[in-house]
Regions:
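Loop-to-transmembrane helix boundary motifs in multi-pass membrane proteins
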Residues: 100, 139-145, 315, 347-382
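Flexible loop linkers connecting adjacent transmembrane helices
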Residues: 6-11, 46-48, 73-99, 130, ...
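Juxtamembrane transmembrane-helix boundary signature
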Residues: 33, 60-95, 107-114, 334
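Membrane-interface "cap" regions at the ends of multi-pass membrane proteins
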Residues: 1-42, 102, 214, 238-243, ...
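C-terminal membrane-solvent junction of multi-pass transporters and transport-like membrane proteins
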Residues: 168, 351, 355-367, 391-444
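Extracellular/periplasmic helix-exit of transmembrane alpha-helices
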Residues: 70-81, 233-234, 240-241, 271-302
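Hydrophobic alpha-helical segments and their helix-loop junctions in multi-pass secondary transporters
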Residues: 171-207, 212-231, 405-417, 439-451
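Hydrophobic transmembrane alpha-helices that form the core helical bundles
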Residues: 101-134, 328-348, 392, 437
């Protein structure tokens, strides 16, 4: 195979695995996605929503994790069939150009710039946890150290390193979080499924809705993570293994085989991040809501630590801090890895660089790998309100999801398809789309009606 996974030719062709066990060997993009998803504010946003709403809004978390998967699959399928990244596909969406770039490309660029605040909040949360573990270093020092470590791990741009480190981190925080939820049944905060079902509400207050919509934008596959998934599918080799499109029966069979591998990858990832995200919410609802404690900026980490210390005991505080570090740092790590691909691709579509040139791409990835973490660090050191920063980024992500939905519809009905999708696939896609649009519009209306943002 070529050293550049973005170049597709006859020499890159590989037949897809047929057995389930063999398919497992080709999973990977979903691991990186899970590291980004579970870390990207779930510890903060999801637990805070649980603390505010109790079990009433649990349905939003489940909906958020499940609803966006079909859109993610449509993006992954399009990438495998066309070899295009999400940004390259956005450049072919209908609509006007602004300068050299399509409106959709500019929209992603603006959204990512606004989301600098969100990731800055996550990086800041990581620094706060490290300061609690090692107080001899200030939060300022840990913020800069975290930025430097993230950059040093990513700047060479090796996919295999990113995948392996992502898998390690999600394993650690998954075990810790699920263990904490399990042992909750031996405490006064135990609950049953009847508590969840009987307390579910669909008419939420404006304040809770603002947090819920922010959480909906962050939890599950967020808009920027759907975009990022296309790069990981390419760098894992799925598109290159299919080979150049030629419409032969052999090509179609090979394409369907690798699409099936991608489907399995996405389902495994969904199972992982849904389980952990739901656990965070339930811990927040069972422990913090019951105690009447909602995380705030002054006692954010101390309050969040209760979800572990109240189930695993006071001795687990260190375990929470270590687990919290991996949860938040995994998001910084995976987001940086993704954005180092997306930003150079955007620059290429705007005519500033050439993403197709592997040497130029590697240089830009290296530069962006160092610029972004320190930009995130600067936003945190300037604002110093990680909770608001994380939730505000979720709001931006919810808006960007509207464009992602439009792109998914364009891929499905206007761009290349291997064959006409079945009724089940189309039904799932439309449920996904309606859920995203419905919750997004509902949230905007409720927020402006109550004029309560946080």
């Amino acid at each position: 195979m070529n050293t550049d996974p973005y170049i597709i030719g006859d020499s890159t062709v590989k037949e897809p695995p047929t057995s389930f066990v063999h398919k497992l060997k080709f999973l990977g993009p979903g691991f990186i996605l899970s590291a980004s998803i579970v870390g990207s504010g779930e510890l903060i946003a999801t637990t805070t929503l649980g603390a505010k709403a109790g079990f009433a809004a649990f349905w939003i978390i489940i909906l958020s994790c499940l609803a966006k998967v079909a859109v993610q699959l449509e993006f992954g399928k399009h990438t495998i069939l066309s070899g295009e990244t999400a940004i390259q596909a956005f450049a072919k969406l209908p609509g006007p150009k602004i300068g050299k770039g399509k409106w959709a490309v500019w929209m992603v660029l603006v959204a990512l710039i606004l989301k600098l605040v969100q990731v800055g909040g996550i990086l800041g949360g990581t620094a706060i946890i490290l300061n609690m573990l090692f107080p001899s270093f200030s939060i300022l020092s840990w913020t800069l150290i975290t930025a430097m470590v993230a950059a040093s791990l990513i700047f060479k741009g090796y996919y295999s390193t990113i995948e392996k480190l992502s898998l390690l981190m999600i394993t650690l925080f998954t075990v810790l979080t699920l263990a904490s939820l399990y042992f909750l049944k031996y405490t006064p905060y135990s609950f049953s499924w009847n508590n969840i079902i009987h307390n579910a509400q669909f008419n939420l207050s404006g304040e809770v809705t603002a947090v819920a919509i922010g959480a909906f934008g962050i939890t599950g596959v967020a808009s920027d993570e759907i975009i990022a998934y296309t790069y990981w599918c390419i760098e894992k080799g799925y598109a290159a293994y299919v080979g150049p499109r030629n419409e032969t029966p052999e090509w179609k069979a090979r394409a369907q085989g690798w699409i099936n591998v991608m489907y399995l990858d996405a389902i495994v990832a969904m199972t992982l991040y849904t389980s952990v995200t739901a656990a965070f919410y339930l811990l927040g609802a069972a422990v913090l809501h019951h105690r009447g404690e909602v995380p705030d900026e002054n006692h954010l980490v101390e309050t969040l630590s209760l979800i572990f210390t109240q189930s695993l005991g006071q001795g687990s505080r260190i375990a929470f801090l270590v687990g919290g570090f991996f949860v938040l740092f995994s998001s910084v790590f995976a987001t940086l890895a993704a954005w180092t691909r997306v930003f150079p691709d955007i620059f290429s579509q705007l005519g500033w660089t050439d993403f197709g040139n592997i040497l130029e791409r590697k240089k830009i990835i290296a530069v962006v790998s160092w610029v972004l973490p320190f930009a995130w660090a600067t936003t945190f050191l300037f604002m110093k309100v990680p909770l608001v920063m994380v939730l505000s980024g979720g709001m931006v992500g919810s808006v960007l999801l509207f464009m992602v939905v439009f792109a998914a519809l364009h891929f499905r009905y206007k761009r290349m398809q291997l064959s006409r999708p079945g009724l089940f696939y189309d039904t799932a896609l439309w449920i996904s789309i309606i859920s995203i649009l419905g919750v997004g519009i509902y949230g905007v209306v409720k927020i402006f009606a109550h004029l309560e943002f946080f």
